[in-house]
């Protein structure tokens, strides 16, 4: 695939940790937790970017990360290129190792909401308290624990509903789902669902979507009547083929967002894009913008187009979709002029005309924050 880059790409380094990946040391990348227990430099310096949230008011980017020593949250200032450690390590517990997916900014409250994930083995989690739902007060610079929905389980993804004051969590290792009322400060319900999404969102009527059973069918939870339904026939046609690609045991959904046009948009581990109608529960296949696996993040741009990032193993590309014509345009590869390339994208946010991409799982070095200028059009698309 030949692509002429329409974007200007740079990367930002928080901790420049590098590692010899000779055959003798290659296993350090494979056994991250075990290795960090023996290597202080690896424990404190090695990190990956996993979740992003853009603050329009302060023009700062909040960055959730994977970090063995608990430094999981930083603020990035694009005007200076500087990162600020927000001090999560002061409240971190033993198994708190990442903000995997779901870093939600409530602009009215000036607060961030997220859940805590782990890399610990199952034996290490037997006596563990479980992943916490967290709130960070930006102005007070304070972390508060909202609650622990499922003891012994850690939170791979969250969804946040500021209107109905709800948080939703998707868990490993049991592949469960939980609904938490922020208003009442309690767990509303929790279920083993035998599938897991990478990240999800809430539809216009307040329903949150996930996948369940070995077939990875969609479910919808509606907090207004505390109802959880599995609509008949609402399943991705490639659900089984797309499963297990994100990581072992993962479901097919790489990203699911509210498109702001009455529909939900779904990407899969195969890199496909679908439109989901919450009213009819029908799924329409739009296309596959790249010839590689993965599409971990999609966002709606200021011009009305749908923007995505996908690819893997150093072949990471930005693309956009005209939802009216269902056509795709590949904007360019996420790679800098010095030859450094984004190894594996994990999240993306749009800030004006710029796309920021979180990089994870990069072998031999820490992950970087990627800045792709000129990615997003300036004016709303006209019909």
Regions found by a protein language model. Give the residues of each.
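Short loop/turn segments that connect beta-strands within beta-propeller blades
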Residues: 77-81, 137-141, 181-185, 222-226, ...
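Surface-exposed loop and turn segments in beta-propeller and other repeat-based domains
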Residues: 13-42, 87-95, 147-153, 230-248, ...
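Conserved beta-propeller blade signature
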Residues: 60-63, 112-113, 166-169, 207-210, ...
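Beta-strand-rich domains and repeat architectures in extracellular enzymes and scaffolds
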Residues: 4, 34-68
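Repeated scaffold domains used in trafficking and secretory/extracellular systems
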Residues: 46-53, 95-104, 152-160, 195-203, ...
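Blade-level signature of beta-propeller repeat domains, shared across WD40, Kelch, NHL, RCC1
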Residues: 342-383
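Residue-level signature of beta-propeller blades and closely related beta-rich strand-turn architectures
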Residues: 67, 117-119, 173, 214, ...
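Short, conserved, GDST-rich strand-edge loop motifs in beta-rich repeat architectures
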Residues: 114-129, 361-363, 367-368
